[in-house]
């Protein structure tokens, strides 16, 4: 419940001895009939501060272009639009830049084809997506587990709403795991990237009663 206040539709899934509890602010994919949309997030500041700067804008634009390209693979030509671009929103205890990219699916596109074209979400891979995924697999020492995937509801008629599993806790074997991170580009400042990760983590850790300052040392 403490996490749900960050997003009313925060997804939760549990099984025998494990659970995934998400406070994700990011809509990975929504489908209603043949209308499909995604709302990528890039650019983060502490709550109350403005997100500004060339790096954030360039990174966000890159991801919007990637999402447009992904949706264009399964949508009617010319139907993909981005009616909302780099809007500033207060989400999950921080301030983000959010865009909305949407289109109209081609006749006959099913769930498998839609997910194959769009998964994983571009905001957690970077671009070009396939090359970035290969580099992530080479560089990261452990798997991401439940993090950076998608979780939500798929209905019998094909409609769906999936959150990107960022700001997500995984509980198993008596331990709780939370993954946070950020996009790294050529001119990234390592210290700033670490601080951005803590900016994302602090509200969630505080919500569940974790000793935030101890963990940050």
Task: Map each language-model feature to its residues.
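Extended alpha-helical targeting/anchoring segments
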Residues: 1-217
């Amino acid at each position: 419940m403490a996490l749900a206040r960050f997003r009313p539709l925060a997804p939760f899934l549990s099984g025998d001895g494990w659970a995934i509890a998400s406070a994700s602010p990011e809509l990975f994919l929504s489908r209603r009939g043949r209308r499909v949309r995604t709302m990528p997030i890039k650019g983060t500041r502490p709550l109350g501060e403005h997100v500004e700067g060339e790096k954030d804008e360039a990174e966000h634009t890159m991801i919007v272009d990637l999402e447009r390209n992904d949706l264009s693979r399964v949508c009617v030509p010319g139907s993909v639009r981005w009616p909302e671009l780099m809007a500033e929103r207060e989400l999950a205890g921080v301030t983000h830049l959010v865009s909305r990219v949407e289109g109209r699916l081609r006749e006959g596109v099913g769930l498998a084809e839609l997910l194959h074209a769009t998964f994983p979400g571009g905001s957690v891979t970077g671009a070009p997506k396939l090359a970035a995924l290969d580099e992530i697999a080479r560089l990261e020492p452990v798997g991401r587990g439940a993090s950076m995937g998608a979780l939500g509801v798929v209905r019998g008629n094909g409609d769906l709403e999936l959150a990107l599993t960022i700001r997500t806790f995984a509980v198993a074997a008596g331990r709780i795991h939370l993954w946070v991170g950020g996009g790294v580009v050529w001119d990234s400042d390592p210290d700033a990237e670490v601080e951005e990760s803590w900016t994302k983590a602090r509200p969630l850790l505080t919500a569940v009663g974790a000793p935030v300052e101890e963990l940050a040392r």
